[in-house]
């Protein structure tokens, strides 16, 4: 009787297993990921620059 909750949890978790992540990506998927990473990096840099200290410029990241 104690095994029933374990089996229920396993049946819930199994469909979310990362099987698609283990497959190799196509060139198109890699290009999309690269563009997304570049955009994310640019947004992060702009966010960091917009929150600089106006008085003490040493707290601002270079670039």
UniProtKB/Swiss-Prot annotation:
Sites bearing Proline amide, chain numbering: 62
GO cellular component term of the entry, any: extracellular region
Subcellular location: Secreted
Propeptide feature: residues: 23-50
Chain coiled-coil ranges: none
Comment on protein domains: The cysteine framework is V (CC-CC).
Family: Belongs to the conotoxin T superfamily.
Protein name in UniProt: Conotoxin Vi5.1b
Biological source species: Conus virgo (Virgin cone)
């Amino acid at each position: 009787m104690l095994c029933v909750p374990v089996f229920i949890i396993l049946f819930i978790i199994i469909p979310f297993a990362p099987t698609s992540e283990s497959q190799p990506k196509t060139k198109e998927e890699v290009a999309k990921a690269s563009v997304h990473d570049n955009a994310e990096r640019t947004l992060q840099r702009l966010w960091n620059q917009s929150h600089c200290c106006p008085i003490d410029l040493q707290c601002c990241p270079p670039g």
